[in-house]
Amino acid sequence: MGDDANAKLFRERAGWWRNLFNSKTGYIQPRNADGSWKKVDFNIENDDDYVEGSGAQYLWMVPFDPAGLFEKLGGVEKATARMDRFFYGRDGSLAVTKAGYDHAELANEPSIASPWLYDFAGAPWHSRFSTPVVRCRTIVRS
């Protein structure tokens, strides 16, 4: 509140995710110290260079810049279609936990806030539909 210098600093830092977005693969990927991509033969199934997630799951971990992410993915319509593939299995059921490297894992940090990105894409009904299912499947009741 009123700290414009730090606000500017952190707004800029929040955009650093773009340094890890590989537009050739369409995923967030690790880089080497020299700036080259760590794996030239990137395979989404390989999670060796990620912590508790995959490139597909880390892609959506940009809650502070959804507009920028959607732009990188080719616009809101393409981003929404991609989110649909991320959250839903081929049979149309929600794929929100234990569904594989290319789907959400909402019991884990990299994916946990991703359903709300639909709100920023102008499709809030997706968030309202998925979050009760997520709550029932992933939150342990005491």
Over which residues does each language-model region extend?
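Active-site core of glycosidic bond-cleaving carbohydrate-active enzymes
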Residues: 1-142
